């Protein structure tokens, strides 16, 4: 695999990808470079060939990628990687795929994976919609996790939120029947939108009933996003959906 960043970290991000939804386009995250620490830069230089997946826009055989058949869990927007690392440490029988656009977060997790010798984890530094549409086969995933996505809390920016109908339908296609979607947010308004979208998406059933949430499952640790939200007086909503 090639290093997605040269030693100067100068790769220009591609144009954001979109999913058409009527007359409106739903955008995934925009690649964000951020600042590298020397350790994070070394992570890309030294760890990416082992744990990274270079996006090429072609369907991928995930069992071949990991060298085994196992349940496949995708986390979209893993941030600093704490939740993914926790899951990989506590259930190594599963294979984990992470997508994150913030390069320093990717670098941090690369170093952690090397420390853990976690060869059952692979990372993308790319647009989530492009990865799902072009590299993940329909029915290839057992679970999709989306923890604390950007709430775009200003009303005029709500349309930029990730959980839109077109994106939910894309996730349904990639989950096998019997698979699971787990979302978490500390913004009540975003939880309301998630219910609006996901409860109405064919192929998804809310495990807690319409407009319901569940207690934080033991496979999701309390993240720094969650802690920050609680300090601001926000609640936290975990939404769990089964793929029919």
Curated annotation (Swiss-Prot):
Positions contributing to substrate binding: 154, 186, 223-226
Coiled-coil ranges (or none): none
EC primary class: transferase
A Pfam family it matches: Methyltransf_4
GO cellular component annotations of the record: tRNA methyltransferase complex
Pathway(s) annotated for this protein in UniProt: tRNA modification; N(7)-methylguanine-tRNA biosynthesis
InterPro entries documented for this protein: SAM-dependent_MTases_sf, tRNA_(Gua-N-7)_MeTrfase_Trmb, tRNA_methyltr_TrmB_bact
Entry's EC annotation: 2.1.1.33
GO MF: tRNA (guanine(46)-N7)-methyltransferase activity
Positions contributing to S-adenosyl-L-methionine binding: 75, 100, 127, 150
Sequence segments annotated as region (Disordered): 1-22
Catalytic residue list: 150
Gene3D superfamilies in UniProt: Vaccinia Virus protein VP39
Region ranges (Interaction with RNA): 156-161
Catalytic activity, as annotated: guanosine(46) in tRNA + S-adenosyl-L-methionine = N(7)-methylguanosine(46) in tRNA + S-adenosyl-L-homocysteine
Keywords assigned: Methyltransferase, S-adenosyl-L-methionine, Transferase, tRNA processing
Highest taxon, organism lineage: Bacteria
Function as written in the Swiss-Prot or TrEMBL entry: Catalyzes the formation of N(7)-methylguanine at position 46 (m7G46) in tRNA.
PANTHER family assigned to the protein according to its UniProt record, in alphabetical order: 3-DEOXY-D-MANNO-OCTULOSONIC-ACID TRANSFERASE/TRNA GUANINE-N 7 - -METHYLTRANSFERASE, PENTACOTRIPEPTIDE-REPEAT REGION OF PRORP DOMAIN-CONTAINING PROTEIN
NCBIfam families: tRNA (guanosine(46)-N7)-methyltransferase TrmB
Family: Belongs to the class I-like SAM-binding methyltransferase superfamily. TrmB family.
UniProt cross-references to HAMAP family, sorted A to Z: tRNA_methyltr_TrmB
Name used for this protein in its record: tRNA (guanine-N(7)-)-methyltransferase
Organism whose genome encodes this protein: Stenotrophomonas maltophilia (strain R551-3)
